[in-house]
Amino acid sequence: MAGENGLTYAAAGVDIDAGNAMVEAIKPLVRSTRRPGADAEIGGFGGLFDLKAAGFSDPILVAANDGVGTKVKIAIETGRHDTIGIDLVAMCVNDIVVQGAEPLFFLDYYATGKLVPGVGAAIVTGIAEGCRQAGCALIGGETAEMPGLYDGSDYDLAGFAVGAAERGALLPTDGVAPGDLVLGLPSSGVHSNGFSLVRRIVSASGLPWDAPAPFAPGRSLGEALLTPTRIYVRPLLAALRATGRGAIKALAHITGGGFPDNLPRVLPEAVGIALDLDAVAVPPVFGWLARTGGVAVPEMLRTFNCGIGMVVVVAPERIEAVEAALRAAGEAPVRLGTVTPRGEAPVSFAGRLGL
């Protein structure tokens, strides 16, 4: 039998009591995400969801998982942790809604070298806010304290979301064809991809995170770059329901890879998309990044959303109805281009990006 001075888990760097205290602290946040089908209680071995109570009769489940990349490093270095969870939810639920599905529930994974009081709860504050924006329940998660694997209080996040659509309602439809029109929905800024390049540019600029943001008066550089990813779930679901099957033919979440890599994911082999860059209202952050980093336009287009976080492919005869439904839901759609026969590249560009 080990003596009184034998090793303990706490001595090895894992504080079970701190983990339990965090779970208790976040329970009210989790409960705030309750919705039909989920009571949003945590602490059991698994989370439960009742599809019938959510109103589905013949559903297809849609699952997605993602992270926030090195944007999390800015949260760590600035000490601001209460919005990065919104990004985490957004990256998952936006990938679900583009398939015509309603996000239903979310789970998170928070891994760190050392649990710091208040940090985990701040992260979950953002996750709960993201879930409320998306209308999905936070039904579980994992907090992993792993000394030696992460440096000090560094952490990483992963999210997992599941949604559902009635059979026959999934997107894209098989009817995407030349002549269809392409709408764009504005982004809030950089969103959650390209941050390894963002951080390299900031380092080259010599500006600290608390310096005034050159592109956002009244905000610090770190605060401006931590602007949360937009969650498009509610306006898109509202537009899909208001306009009926066939009006919206496809949706594309513009993340890493930009327009060139994400648009072909929802297109049939024989068609492409022609985009008018003059139609894009580019947020000032992208101009600053391009100028400060000397980043060429093709690299900007393949790394960042450049001001458009979601693309909507619409039947031309229904374009006014879709635009009206999106505006009624609080969106500001812009006409970006058209679906064309596929040329040399699946995505072609005209006009000039206003960097």
UniProtKB/Swiss-Prot annotation:
Pathway stated in the Swiss-Prot or TrEMBL entry: Purine metabolism; IMP biosynthesis via de novo pathway; 5-amino-1-(5-phospho-D-ribosyl)imidazole from N(2)-formyl-N(1)-(5-phospho-D-ribosyl)glycinamide: step 2/2
Pfam families in the record: AIRS, AIRS_C
Reaction equation(s) it catalyzes: 2-formamido-N(1)-(5-O-phospho-beta-D-ribosyl)acetamidine + ATP = 5-amino-1-(5-phospho-beta-D-ribosyl)imidazole + ADP + phosphate + H(+)
Principal location listed in the UniProt entry: cytoplasm
Keywords, alphabetical: ATP-binding, Cytoplasm, Ligase, Nucleotide-binding, Purine biosynthesis
EC number: 6.3.3.1
Source organism, top-level taxon: Bacteria
Major enzyme class: ligase
Disulfide bonds: none
Single GO term (MF): phosphoribosylamine-glycine ligase activity
GO BP: 'de novo' IMP biosynthetic process; adenine biosynthetic process
Record's subcellular location: Cytoplasm
GO cellular component, one term: cytosol
Record-linked InterPro entries: PurM-like_C_dom (IPR010918), PurM-like_C_sf (IPR036676), PurM-like_N (IPR016188), PurM-like_N_sf (IPR036921), PurM_cligase (IPR004733)
Protein family (similarity comment): Belongs to the AIR synthase family.
Protein name: Phosphoribosylformylglycinamidine cyclo-ligase
Lineage per the UniProt record: Bacteria, Pseudomonadati, Pseudomonadota, Alphaproteobacteria, Hyphomicrobiales
